[in-house]
């Protein structure tokens, strides 16, 4: 575990995010939960101000933070404030919770690339914030779409989606 790194991302309902991100090369483990809100020990029914988020443990020898962020921006709409699909509210906001200054720098650079690319019709509204405590969600929410493959999701990879760096745009 000592060679692994951690990322925390929020981009709508955590079920769909986890289902897609856990399958990415280099991802060692994922868990869904709540972060960025007002109360300790939040629950699905009581998480004021918290975002539904995913904590990702990854192997930097197999993938990097930038690659995770590029996939994150491909599978959710970062241009809708507090909404993904039918899910509306601050729980479903787009937010990157960075664990160190390097992640913050990479997040801001990636957002600038997404904005410059024109791949999305609007400007990115994804917030970038220091990672507060991550509270693991209840067991029934972990790996939800693995247990219920026909369950609800509003996340999907967009075919042919490739994020160019600003210099390439």
UniProtKB/Swiss-Prot annotation:
Which residues constitute the catalytic centre?
13
* UniProt-listed GO biological process terms: protein modification process
- Write down the EC number: 1.8.4.11
Question: What are the UniProt keywords, alphabetically?
Answer: Oxidoreductase
> Which Pfam family, any one of them, does this sequence belong to?
PMSR
Per its record, what are the GO molecular function terms?
L-methionine:thioredoxin-disulfide S-oxidoreductase activity; peptide-methionine (S)-S-oxide reductase activity
- Top-rank taxon: Bacteria
Which InterPro entries does this UniProt record tie to the protein? Met_Sox_Rdtase_MsrA_dom, Met_Sox_Rdtase_MsrA_sf
Q: Which reaction does it catalyse?
A: L-methionyl-[protein] + [thioredoxin]-disulfide + H2O = L-methionyl-(S)-S-oxide-[protein] + [thioredoxin]-dithiol; [thioredoxin]-disulfide + L-methionine + H2O = L-methionine (S)-S-oxide + [thioredoxin]-dithiol
HAMAP family according to UniProt: MsrA
Q: What is this protein called?
A: Peptide methionine sulfoxide reductase MsrA
């Amino acid at each position: 575990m000592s060679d692994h790194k951690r990322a925390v991302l929020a981009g709508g309902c955590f079920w769909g995010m986890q289902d897609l991100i856990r399958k990415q090369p280099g991802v060692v483990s994922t868990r869904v939960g709540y972060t960025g809100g007002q109360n300790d020990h939040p629950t699905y029914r009581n998480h004021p101000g918290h975002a539904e988020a995913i904590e990702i443990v990854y192997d930097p020898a197999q993938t990097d933070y930038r690659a995770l962020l590029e996939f994150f921006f491909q599978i959710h709409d970062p241009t809708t404030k507090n909404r993904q699909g039918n899910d509306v509210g601050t729980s479903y906001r787009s937010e990157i919770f960075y664990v160190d200054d390097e992640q913050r720098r990479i997040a801001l650079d990636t957002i600038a690339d997404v904005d410059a690319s024109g791949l999305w019709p609007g400007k990115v509204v994804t917030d970038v914030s220091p990672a507060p405590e991550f509270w693991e969600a209840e067991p029934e929410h972990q790996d939800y779409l693995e247990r219920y493959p026909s369950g609800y999701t509003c996340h999907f990879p967009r075919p042919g989606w490739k994020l160019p760096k600003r210099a390439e745009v």
